[in-house]
Amino acid sequence: MNRIEERLAALKEEGKKAFITYTTAGLPDYDTTKKIMFAQEKAGIDIMEIGVPFSDPIADGPVIQDASFKAIQNGASLEGIFTMMGKVRKAGLNSPVVFMLYYNTVYHYGVENFVNKCIENGVDGLIIPDLPFEEQGEIKDVLAKNEKSPILIQLVSPVSKGRIPMLLENARGFVYCVSQMGVTGKGANFHSQIREYLTEVKKESKIPVMMGFGIRTAADVAPLEDIIDGAIVGSHFIKLLEANNYSEEAATDYVATFKKELNA
């Protein structure tokens, strides 16, 4: 078990749901990102998704695209983010961390080098939205070489119907359910058949099912809390941090409130 699996097993034992946030690394700088990570841990975050900025983030909506571009302009790079991760681990951060990034970044860094750096710096999971299931063979082979490798998180969407059993057969960690079509950050206008879709995913999944895309508050997911095992907030958290000048207090308050309401 790695940190993700340990945390999710503990939550299951406690009968609680997971809360996951997304933060763009290096926005406005690495020191601020580190402070926000520790602030979230203090508030009881379950898993942190850290976005690696990319110049063409096709799966992301305008908020995360803008954050990505700003971070790149401020000098954020994969190498710098690995260094930042190493520092937060050495400083005592224990929360599970998942990198969300595009395969182009992994490919240009070198798949084996990338995985080794993840192991070295305490990265627990990977979300690669532009890497189709059929093309995951190379990175899966490299990940399988070391038991300390990060987990490749499987994404499923409303158009995955019919493919869900195949997608989830060997999935680990958690399933990331895209709750609506299109890009991130559109608000809680969930797919009209979301309940049927999530029920099918839950039926096929041996691991926790998380819902993301367009979530702002725990109330957004309340109608589906009997199906899902947790919620992921991205664009709204980015906007909240920016509106509050990347205040640690704002991050702590938001995470603590969302977690409390999610498990009320």
Swiss-Prot record:
Keywords attached to this Swiss-Prot or TrEMBL record, sorted alphabetically, are: Amino-acid biosynthesis, Aromatic amino acid biosynthesis, Lyase, Tryptophan biosynthesis
Give this protein's Gene Ontology molecular function annotations.
Answer: tryptophan synthase activity
Answer whether the UniProt record assigns the keyword ATP-binding to this protein: no
Give the enzyme's main class according to its UniProt record, as a single word.
lyase
Q: Which reaction does it catalyse?
A: (1S,2R)-1-C-(indol-3-yl)glycerol 3-phosphate + L-serine = D-glyceraldehyde 3-phosphate + L-tryptophan + H2O
- Which domain of life does this protein belong to? Bacteria
Q: Which family does it belong to?
A: Belongs to the TrpA family.
Q: What is this protein called?
A: Tryptophan synthase alpha chain
- The organism named in the record is Lachnospira eligens (strain ATCC 27750 / DSM 3376 / VPI C15-48 / C15-B4)
